[in-house]
Amino acid sequence: MRHLLFLCPCVIGVAFHLWLFNFSGLFSWFLVWSPHSYDIVVGVLSARHNHELRNVIRHTWLQHLNHHSSLSQRVLVKFIIGSHGCDIPVEDREDPYSCKLLNITNPTLKQEIESFSIPDSAAVITEHHVVNVNFRVLYPVVITRLGVFQHDSAAGFQRNITVKLFQTEHEEALFSARFSPASSGVQVNGIWYKPVEQFILPEGFEGTVVWESHDPEGLLSGNVHHVIVNDGGGIFRLTTVKEGLLPYEFTEGVEGIAGGFTYTIHEGETLLNTLETRPERIQNHLAALEKEDALLQEESTTFQDIVFVNVVDTYRNVPSKLLNFYRWTVQLTRFEFLLKTDDDCFIDIDNVLKMVAQKELQKENAWWGNFRLNWAVDRTGKWQELEYLSPAYPAFACGSGYIISNDIVQWLAVNSQRLKTYQGEDVSMGIWMSAIGPSRYQDSRWLCEKKCEAGMLSSPQYTPQELMEIWQQKERCGNPCACEDR
């Protein structure tokens, strides 16, 4: 036992010596692999198929950086690309901005379709005098009649009710029908209908049907989740509060259904042909995706300037692409500022670096860009925003180019799993930044629209050929917009 006690200090000493040796080796390894520190990391949002735009950047301002060692040591440029392409062809999606299948099956053709019916157990007289429901058209239809639920079949129609159909964000009804005891319309399957002027509601149309009682008594209506919806095989769908969507600003009353409308499917034969050719189209699309994946991997290996982020690469996922890139920068790089731009934008990187020095931007809580103020929220189209309640967005910088300090990137990266994404990355940034109140540096030289101005820092929406032309002009005469005749 005495010998064992004598040996213990020796064993501890050897172990401590080995620990010091291993720690010093680990520390040396950390120093070797410690990331290079940059003044600016540039993140270029790029769609998977935009090979030509990326190559133009590589042969213009990015090549200029790489040919000047002093600049290449200060600036790191990465293209941000989603790891996954959408596996649904554009023709078979609900809209071109997302990756959701247009799920139409067995459409009802060449006849009028009644949109809603209600079981007797689900229909109740409510205290509400105004009831509305929102819907989205997924394939073109023609509305033929508007209707209200039957109140008392024995006594005939004894109510005064107006039904109106609105296009979203429009205060004037597209068409309406007034029901009264003297003019009740035609009764079909428990609903009183009146014809309306017929015209085509296109794919993507966002509409609201509003029923209004002009009597002291409320409307006979049903909860949207208890009413039977006849969507013609997937031709339209309701957009309800349950899906997390907010009511449109002008909509009055409560959500519910107090009647219906009839409709026909427009150009049904074309729809049938589209559905019949879908399997072959999807097969060809998946084969094209495999080729695209291979080309992107080859491109990444060749140029070493792509960051693949784990999202499906669609317009609606651009905010998620950006948050994923912020996480990447924080984990694998060291920098003072981050510049975000798009692959169709001209960037005068020399001017940017010069202005960073001249402005003496604070290295904490700084956001330098060209800010849009009181920008109205769209409820339809490419920039449709259904989940932001306010009528206008907080101040946000135009997406063609802006710079944020490292600590803001750190905050975004740390909170990226909790931050809600909205319809665009620029407005999402404005909403996210409203929580921390950064110091905003307004500068109109980060152009918001496609135009060329001497001294500009960025300008958006160029074709590859146009980007090459303005860069060549800048190289020849120092002005990207024009070279003066000498």
From Swiss-Prot:
Keywords: Endoplasmic reticulum, Glycoprotein, Glycosyltransferase, Golgi apparatus, Membrane, Signal-anchor, Transferase, Transmembrane, Transmembrane helix. Glycans are attached at N103, N160. Residues 32-486 are lumenal. It is found in: Golgi apparatus membrane; Endoplasmic reticulum. It holds the Pfam family Galactosyl_T. Pathway: Protein modification; protein glycosylation. It comes from the Eukaryota. Its main location: Golgi. GO terms for molecular function: acetylgalactosaminyltransferase activity; UDP-glycosyltransferase activity. The keyword Cell wall biogenesis/degradation does not apply. GO terms for biological process: protein glycosylation; protein O-linked glycosylation. The chain crosses the membrane at residues 11-31. It is an enzyme of class 2 (transferase). It is a single-pass type II membrane protein. It catalyses: 3-O-(N-acetyl-beta-D-glucosaminyl-(1->4)-alpha-D-mannosyl)-L-threonyl-[protein] + UDP-N-acetyl-alpha-D-galactosamine = 3-O-[beta-D-GalNAc-(1->3)-beta-D-GlcNAc-(1->4)-alpha-D-Man]-L-Thr-[protein] + UDP + H(+). Its EC number is 2.4.1.313. Residues 1-10 are cytoplasmic. GO terms for cellular component: endoplasmic reticulum; Golgi membrane. Beta-1,3-N-acetylgalactosaminyltransferase that synthesizes a unique carbohydrate structure, GalNAc-beta-1-3GlcNAc, on N- and O-glycans. Has no galactose nor galactosaminyl transferase activity toward any acceptor substrate. Involved in alpha-dystroglycan (dag1) glycosylation. Belongs to the glycosyltransferase 31 family. This is UDP-GalNAc:beta-1,3-N-acetylgalactosaminyltransferase 2. It comes from Xenopus laevis (African clawed frog). The gene is b3galnt2.
